């Protein structure tokens, strides 16, 4: 019996061996069909479609529809029995019997078919093609065997969870998380001796001629692109290479003024242009060296701190508070009652008489005025008292 029939299942051809089901399907001699029998006998055609349920149902319906009509014809004896061999006693098994025999084959064949189905399932899973589009209630998958539809048991696929799960991506194809694609430079500073960078002071300190100008807009754009591509912190370039603060460099790069009207930033832009002319490896290395090494290599003088306007003196050299003698204090109070704002000549005369500095005399009168309550000036009070003593009216103010 020839079992070389094949069945196409979702693009894959399943070949049946010659000895497949040889123990269960008997060999039947093929004879010409009698002319009296209509072509609606229980012999379904070979299915080549993918709709398993339709083919199996079609075969069952054909068997069911022909069973009633054939039984009446067989009983009447008007036509020979098609399922008998030469009109003898041996009948060919019906389609239902073939199905029942096939369903009762031993565990070895079940394991063989299960292995074939597992292989097919793995193949379809790799190509991301669904294994079978049949309902979970269907447990039979028809296969054409010698012009008969033999139903083979098929493992029912497990029901998937309701939640959608994204297909797993191999680790080799996984992309890095956002923000981790670019390797950040190490924060540890490197040594100039390891890189072998020589003296760059002549290159970094060169100046252009008086009749030449630099394109500040272009230099600013190139600096920003270089910092972004090489992952260089702006503060490192500003402090170590340019000798400026990070805020000053940010202002120069954000709003670069034309070279003609620029006054204070020309040296910084000249140094930036010299830095851009260096090799890319050297440019990046200068920004991650120690500040002292960069200053030594590039010949940049370290910035000196601004001198404080008033330096603190040691505690033993502090200026002590001046104390007046009682005679000096009485003389100054007497003059203050008569004139709270003495002129320069009067202050000099007092300082010479009392043996004091003129600044000390001036400070005394200023402090005395601050201690007075907010009232009429001392000179007006003295005039008013003098008028009362002599029974004369005081000064009147006419507005």
From Swiss-Prot:
What's one GO BP annotation on this UniProt entry?
A: regulation of transcription by RNA polymerase II
- Region span, Disordered: 32-91, 158-187
For bias type Low complexity, the affected ranges are: 60-79
The entry's DNA-binding region feature spans: 205-291, 315-374
- Keywords in alphabetical order: Chromosome, DNA-binding, Homeobox, Nucleus, Transcription, Transcription regulation
Question: Could you tell me what this protein does?
Answer: Transcriptional regulator which is involved in the sex determination and X chromosome dosage compensation pathways. Directly binds to 5'-ATTGAT-3' sites in the promoter of sex-determining factor xol-1 to negatively regulate its expression and promote hermaphrodite development. Associates with condensed DNA during mitosis.
What name goes with this protein? Homeobox protein ceh-39
Q: Which organism is it from?
A: Caenorhabditis elegans
What is this organism's lineage?
Eukaryota, Metazoa, Ecdysozoa, Nematoda, Chromadorea
């Amino acid at each position: 019996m020839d079992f070389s029939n094949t069945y196409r299942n979702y693009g894959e051809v399943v070949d049946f061996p010659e000895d497949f089901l040889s123990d269960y399907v008997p060999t039947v001699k093929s004879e010409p069909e009698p002319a009296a029998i209509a072509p609606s006998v229980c012999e379904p055609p070979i299915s080549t479609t993918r709709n398993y349920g339709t083919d199996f149902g079609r075969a069952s319906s054909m068997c069911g529809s022909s069973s009633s009509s054939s039984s009446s014809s067989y009983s009447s004896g008007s036509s020979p029995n098609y399922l008998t061999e030469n009109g003898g006693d041996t009948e060919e098994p019906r389609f239902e019997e073939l199905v029942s025999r096939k369903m009762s084959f031993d565990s070895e064949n079940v394991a063989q078919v299960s292995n074939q189905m597992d292989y097919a399932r793995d193949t379809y899973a790799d190509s991301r093609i669904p294994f079978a589009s049949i309902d979970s209630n269907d447990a039979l998958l028809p296969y054409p065997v010698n012009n008969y539809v033999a139903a083979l048991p098929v493992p029912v696929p497990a029901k998937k969870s309701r939640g959608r799960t994204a297909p797993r991506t191999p680790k080799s194809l996984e992309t890095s998380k956002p923000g981790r694609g670019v390797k950040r430079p190490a924060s540890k500073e490197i040594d100039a001796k390891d890189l072998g960078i020589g003296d760059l002071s002549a290159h970094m300190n060169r100046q252009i001629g008086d009749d030449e100008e630099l394109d500040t807009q272009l230099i600013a754009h190139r600096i920003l692109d270089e910092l972004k591509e090489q992952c260089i912190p702006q503060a490192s370039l500003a402090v170590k290479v340019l000798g400026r603060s990070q805020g000053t460099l940010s202002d120069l790069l954000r709003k670069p003024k034309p070279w003609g009207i620029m006054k204070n930033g020309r040296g910084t832009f000249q140094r930036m242009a010299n830095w851009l002319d260096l090799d890319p490896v050297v440019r990046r290395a200068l920004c991650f060296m120690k500040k002292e090494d960069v200053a030594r290599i590039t010949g940049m003088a370290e910035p000196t701190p601004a001198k404080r306007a008033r330096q603190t003196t040691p505690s033993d050299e502090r200026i002590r508070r001046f104390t007046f003698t009682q005679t000096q204090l009485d003389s100054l109070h007497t003059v203050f009652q008569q004139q709270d704002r003495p002129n320069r000549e009067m202050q000099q005369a007092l300082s010479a008489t009392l043996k004091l500095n003129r600044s000390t005399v001036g400070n005394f009168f200023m402090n005395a005025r601050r201690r007075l309550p907010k009232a009429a000036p001392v000179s007006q009070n003295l005039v008013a008292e003098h008028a009362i003593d002599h029974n004369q009216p005081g000064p009147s103010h006419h507005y």
